[in-house]
Each structure stands twice: as C-alpha cells, then as structure tokens.
Amino acid sequence: MTSTRTLRYAQVACACIWCLFSAGIIFGFAALKPILISEGVYHELCDPKDGDRLLCTAQDLKLNFIFALSATVTNIMALPVGKILDMYGPRVCGIIGSCLLFLASGNFISAKHLVSLWDPYLVGYTLLAVAGPFVFISCFQLANSFPQRSGTVLALLTGSFDSSSALFLLYRLLYQNWFPTLNVSRFFTLYLIVPVFILACQLTIMPHSSYKTVNHIAKIAVEGLDENGRLIEGDTGSGIIPDEQERQSLIAIEREEDSIPSRPQRRKSVLETYVEDKLQKKSGGIFGVLHGKSAYEQIKSPWFYLMLLFALVAMLRINYFIATVRTQEEYLLNDPDLALKLNSIFDMLLPLGGAVSIPFIGLLLDHTDTLSTLTILFTTSTAIGVFGLIPNSFTWNLIGIVLLVVYRPFYYTVVSDYSSKVFGFDTFGTVYGLLSCICGIFNMSQNLLDKWTHTTFNMNPFPINLTLVILTVVFSLTLTFYIRSQILPKPVNERGLSSNYQTI
C-alpha cells in the first residue's frame, strides 16, 4: 500500500516537472523573441534600405506569425488529444508528446542545415505547440491518483502549465547576462533532457491506462463524486455534506438503493441529486441547464455560441498582446527604454500570474455564483483593454499588464468551469474541446491584425485595441443579458430538491 502511494506521489511530481518545462512554453514567446532577433532569425527578409536596424517590419511580422500559428495549433489540438487520451491512454499521449518535443528540438538544433528545405523555426515552434497538449492533457487522469486531493493535484498541474512560459524567460536572462554564446541551437540541445525525461517516466513509473477519462475528471473536480455518482474511495463525504446526521442519513439511503438490483440505465444517486441541487443553487441557477442534452443540441444553444463569441475575442486579445507587447508599448509610451522595461516586467509576471492566482481563483469560484464570476471576468477584460488605450502613462500600462497576467488563467478557468456546469460532464470533452478548437482557428486572425498595425495604422495599436474592447463589451453584455433572461426559479418538490434532478 505504501509503495503504491509513493509511486503515485512520484507520478504527480514527475508530471508537474515536465509540465513546467514543456506544457505551455510557447506562451513565453515575448521572452524568446529578443533572442531570435539578436540571432538574426528572418533578418534576410529585411530590405537593404532599412540599413543596420535590428528589426524591420517584414522580420517582425514573420516572427509574430510563428507565435500566431503556434497558439492556433495548441488550441486546436485540445479536441483530438482528448479523444486519443480516452482511446489509447495517457502513456501513448505522453510518448507522442515526447517524440514531438524531440522533433521540435531537432529543428532548432539543425536550423542552419534545414533552412534550405523548410522553415525550421516555424516548424520547430509549431511542433512545441502540438506537443504541449499531449504532455499536459495526459496528466489530467492523475487527479484521481489521490481521490480526496483531486482538486489539489489539478491545481498543481495547472500551476505548472501557467508557469512553463518562464522557461524562455530563464533562457533570455542567461543569454543576455551570462552566456551570450548560448544560441538557440545550443539551448535546444540542452532541452533534449526534457523529452528524454518524459519518455523515461512514461516507460517506467507512469500508468499505462487512465484512472479516469477527461469527462470523469471534470465531474470529480466539480461535484466530488465519481462517474457513478458515488463517493470517491476513501472519502467520508464530510466535504460535500458537512452536517454529520444529514450525511449519515443520505449515505444510509444510498446503501439501501445499492442493494436494489441494477437497472439497464443509470439514474442519479441520492448523493448526486443532493450535490447537484446544492450546485444549482450555488451557481445561481446555471448548473445543469443543458445537462442530459446531446452535444449537438448544446452546440446549437446560445449558451454555447454566445460564450464562444466572447472567448474568440478574449483569446485573440491575450495572444495578440503576448506577441506584440514590445511594439505596442513603444508606440504608447513613445520611449523604447520604458517599453523594454515593461516588456521585461511582463515576461517575469506572465508565469507568476498563473501560479499565484490559481488558489484565489478557486476561492472565488467556490464562493461566488456563476453569473457574478462572469461579470468579474467581463469587467476585468474590459478594464485591461481600456488601460491598453492610454498613451504616455507607464503606470496605467503597468496596471493593465498586471491585470492581464492574472486575467489569463482566470479566463481559462472560468470558461472551463462554465462549460462543465452548463453542458455537463458527459459531453464536457467534446463541447469544451470544440470551443477551444474554434478559438484556436480564429486566433490566426492575429496575424492579420498585426499586419494592419504595421502597415495601415503605422504601428499605432489604438484602432485594433479599441475595436477589440468594443467587441468585448458587446459580447459580454449579450451573454450577461441572455443568462439573466434564462435563470428562472425552479419548482421545488416535496423533498426540497429541484425538479431538474431525478432521484432513484
């Protein structure tokens, strides 16, 4: 028993380590970009008339395109990776991710030799983006390795993902301050340790099959119950039902129902009914509105496509800023030194934002109804956009950056939480995966916005940012008004439970 527990500790620890060094490293692009510029990547695209300028428009657009494509690909991959995980298990996903990291590193290591065949920087960075979901999503099943601490395990994995963008920040600091000869090729030669580590873990200590599917993990995280609506092994239920007398009464009823011969179709257990009724009230009437519907019916609903519209703009704004933070701040502050300072602050705060804010985000979700949480999300998103419109103010732009690094993990967590509560757990992987996939495809428009900023607007980010702020406000208000119109008092039956939920 002890050895099994030790093994599961080791599994979680190893997963956190490799997520920290591979899951979301592409989002550290703002820190990597100065190194690529210094190494002369794509400098051949510059017109000789540009002189000895370190960065020209064509080069900047091509570098930003690398990130735009990678951010698109990593979001698109969420849907197929979830399916592969459920079909073939976490070991296969982890090994695929490891191989992709090998290939990505190989492109950077041999870039000078491959440049005549294809674009090794674009291919390499895109492969890093594809690898991320494979090595990250395959870890979700570990949330049930310690059933009573599934939320803690998920928080550790999510924190590791959010902090992984720090890898390129560390590289930039080493490159600029101590090891100027540590070029991209040498760095990724050292980076080969990461895929080797992942592969070794997958072939030795990591589980071959999932403890649970992605949908089951979502149910455990939200309800604290397993896929059959039962208490998780080893859980007394005190966290779900604080009152001991009430808890023992419900558990007794549960045991009595368990003795009844099984039915062809599973119906909600007594505990499941109790928990979901509490969640329905706690969420302000949002929990369960589309539970039991098919994925197709859910996708046709305004609950899906109105959230999708907001998510499209939100994700685009986040990734567009990551790619263009330096050039935006140079224009707004009209001071390259201050812009560089803000860029450096952003590089440091981005990985810290997720790690620091995750516990507070959890507390907010636990103690605030869903509509209020969405209102906070919408307000924060709008505020960040407004601060990004203020010229000649280091302070306001700094506040906007601080809000953005906290908002990024907040956005992802709230959209995921909304999806599980509204659409349910049976279709969670499909519906949430589709939402992420569509957002990823739409993210390619980031490249068009960047081109317009460089050419049409002469580096002025104001028109693009203002448009995105207006769209944010419109879509936020539309979704808010729709939710308010749909939340109606639910009839309560004689047992005191909402009629939405079917008991045994």
UniProtKB/Swiss-Prot annotation:
Q: Please give the residue ranges for the topological domain Cytoplasmic.
A: 33-64, 113-119, 172-186, 324-344, 407-421, 484-504
Assigned keywords, A-Z: Membrane, Phosphoprotein, Transmembrane, Transmembrane helix, Transport, Vacuole
GO terms (molecular function) for this protein are: transmembrane transporter activity
Please list every transmembrane segment annotated in the UniProt record, as residue ranges.
Answer: 12-32, 65-85, 92-112, 120-140, 151-171, 187-207, 303-323, 345-365, 386-406, 422-442, 463-483
Q: Indicate how the chain sits in the lipid bilayer.
A: Multi-pass membrane protein
GO CC annotations? fungal-type vacuole; fungal-type vacuole membrane; mitochondrion
Q: Where does this protein chiefly localize?
A: membrane
Localization of this protein: Vacuole membrane
Which residues does this entry mark as bearing Phosphoserine? 238, 249, 269
Q: Which Pfam families match?
A: MFS_1
According to the UniProt topology, which residue ranges lie Vacuolar?
1-11, 86-91, 141-150, 208-302, 366-385, 443-462
Query: Signal peptide span per the entry?
Result: none
Q: Which family does it belong to?
A: Belongs to the SLC43A transporter (TC 2.A.1.44) family.
Show the PANTHER family listed in the entry.
PROTEIN FMP42
Please state what the protein is called: Protein FMP42
Gene field: FMP42
